[in-house]
């Protein structure tokens, strides 16, 4: 048996598709726990409609938006299974992805498994090249670290873990998935990356949403002890990636890069100024359809 946990906040446009993408690949004895936190739209009614027709789905509501850490703890506390798969409320989990994650738990030393996020973004969008480059590079790093036995940074879009490896999640204003990996590692378990467990993720389509998403993640890294990602580390591999892009798209790529650097600066400010969860966790609206 497995438990699939889905934290969600104001995802009325896509939450039903997310849940259905999971239900099609789990067994009758498995369960899906959806935690709706402080929703002010029709997210809860959308979930309730699925609960009414599929007994595998359970809904837990929070009156206020308390962050992903709070929702994850509710999922862990209410999960009937030892293996928990977590995905977000605004993604599509591709067929067989869940099975490809959980097969790794045949090894008792494995405490966490990361899926493979696949960005969805129009080719003519300003951030197209930058988005594909960054996702590809992150995947390459995860695969390399797995081969070296050093992988620990799970992807919050799609991951799985043993409940005994991660009995609770500390409050974090951002990069919750990174904190999860640190705890699993501290508890003596290994983690791996599964490149064939695909999850479709809609990328931000405008500068405002791009900055909102990237800045909150960067703030989370700055708040994480010995955070794994820095501007210096990412700029080191930028020249190599640049020459994989057609020359006529370089201006668009560099423009996106400037916006990206601004998001780093904003993330640093949000972390150092100790801004609240709601101030850090801005919703990129263009990713919600």
Language model segments and positions:
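Short aromatic/hydrophobic "clamp" motif used to bind/position activated sugar donors
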Residues: 84
């Amino acid at each position: 048996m497995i438990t699939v946990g889905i934290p969600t906040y104001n995802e009325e446009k896509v939450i039903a598709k997310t849940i259905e993408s999971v239900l099609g690949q789990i067994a009758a004895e498995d369960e899906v726990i959806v935690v709706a936190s402080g929703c002010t739209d029709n997210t809860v009614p959308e979930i309730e409609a699925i609960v009414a027709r599929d007994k595998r789905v359970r809904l837990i509501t929070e009156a206020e938006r308390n962050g992903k850490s709070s929702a994850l703890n509710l999922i862990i506390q209410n999960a009937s299974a030892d293996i928990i798969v977590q995905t977000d409320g605004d993604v599509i989990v591709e067929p067989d992805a869940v099975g490809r994650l959980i097969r790794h738990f045949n090894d008792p030393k494995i405490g966490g498994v990361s899926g493979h996020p696949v960005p969805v973004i129009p080719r003519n969008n300003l951030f197209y090249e930058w988005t594909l480059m960054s996702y590809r590079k992150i995947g390459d790093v995860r695969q390399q670290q797995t081969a070296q036995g050093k992988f620990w940074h799970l992807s919050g879009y799609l991951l799985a873990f043993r409940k005994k490896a991660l009995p609770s999640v500390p409050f974090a204003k951002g990069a919750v998935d990174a904190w999860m990996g640190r705890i699993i590692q501290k508890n003596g378990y290994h983690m791996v990356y599964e490149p064939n467990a695909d999850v479709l993720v809609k990328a931000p389509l405008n500068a405002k949403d791009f900055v909102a998403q990237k800045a909150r993640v960067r703030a989370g890294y700055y708040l994480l002890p010995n955070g794994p990602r820095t501007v210096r580390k990412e700029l080191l591999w930028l020249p190599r990636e640049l020459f994989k892009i057609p020359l006529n798209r370089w201006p668009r790529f560099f423009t996106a890069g400037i916006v990206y650097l601004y998001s780093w600066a904003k993330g640093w400010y949000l972390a150092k100024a100790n801004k609240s969860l709601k101030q850090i966790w801005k919703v990129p609206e263009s990713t919600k359809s």
